[in-house]
UniProtKB/Swiss-Prot annotation:
Negatively regulates the expression of the ganSPQAB operon. Inhibits transcription of the operon by binding to an operator in the promoter region. In the presence of galactobiose, GanR dissociates from the promoter, resulting in the expression of the gan operon. InterPro entries: HTH_LacI (IPR000843), LacI/GalR-like_sensor (IPR046335), Lambda_DNA-bd_dom_sf (IPR010982), Peripla_BP_I (IPR028082). The keyword Repressor applies. This is HTH-type transcriptional regulator GanR. Coiled coil: none annotated.
Amino acid sequence: MATIKDIAQEAGFSISTVSRVLNNDESLSVPDETREKIYEAAEKLNYRKKTVRPLVKHIAFLYWLTDKEELEDVYFKTMRLEVEKLAKAFNVDMTTYKIADGIESIPEHTEGFIAVGTFSDEELAFLRNLTENGVFIDSTPDPDHFDSVRPDLAQMTRKTVNILTEKGHKSIGFIGGTYKNPNTNQDEMDIREQTFRSYMREKAMLDERYIFCHRGFSVENGYRLMSAAIDTLGDQLPTAFMIAADPIAVGCLQALNEKGIAIPNRVSIVSINNISFAKYVSPPLTTFHIDIHELCKNAVQLLLEQVQDKRRTVKTLYVGAELIVRKSMN
C-alpha cells in the first residue's frame, strides 16, 4: 500500500506538506494547484488513509471453558485466539478471564464483555448487574439483555438431512455430544440433536435406534459412540450419519475404519466446523465451514456499537455456513 513518502516523491512536495494536505490541516496555506497535485498522486498510487480507532478500555473477555474442553475441541481455541487478535485490531483494551478465575474476578469498572462458554443463572445475574454491554459468541443465554452471535446450527442440521435424503439415504443416524447445565449439573440436548429429532420426525424418518449422544465433543467420544453404534446395530447400521462436530467425526471415522466399514460406500458422514485437519483424515471429511473470524468480528463490532454508540436494542445474529464436500459422503 502507498505511503505518505511515496506520494511526496510522486507529487514533488515535502512529506510534511503531503501529510498535512491529506489530513485536511486547515492551518496549512498552500495553492489549490498544490493540493490538486497531491490528491492526484494519492489517487494514482491508490492511497488509503489509515483509520485511527479510539481506544476502548475496560473490556472483559470471559472464556468460560476448561483447559481440557479447549484441548478436546480446537474450535474454541481458534475462537479465543481470534477474539484476542481482533481486540488489538479494533484498539480494544481487553483482559481475558477464564472459568477457573470465577465470575467475581471481573472488576466493577468493566465497561463491557465478550463471552464464550456456558454460564449459570447466577453468573448471568452478576453480569447484568455489572454492565449493560455484552456479547455472547456461540450461544444465546440471555437474549433479553445481551447480544449474541452464533452459527446457525439448526439450519445446517436441516440442510444435512435434506442433502442426504436427496442422495437417496432413507436411514440416517445422528452422533453428537451433550452439554452440562450449570444450574442443574444435568446433561442437556444440544440444538443440533434437537433439530435433527424434530426435522426427522416431520419427515417420518426418525429412528431412535440411530441416535447416539454423550457428554463432550472430543475425538474419544466420537470413537466410543460410533463403536457402540456398530456393536448395537450390526448390519442395520444406517447408511448415513450426521455428526455434531468435526472432533467427534474424526473418532467416528477411526471406529468405522477399524471395523472395515467402507466410507462412503457403506456409511456416509457429514459433520460441522471444518477444522484444520478435516481435509487430512481418511477419507477427507464433508463438513460445514463455520467462519470463526466472521463470528468474532461481528461480536467485537456489536460490542463497540453498545459501548461507543450507546445502542440499547438487543441483537441476536445467526451466521450461515458453507458445506465443503469431500470424500466422506456420496
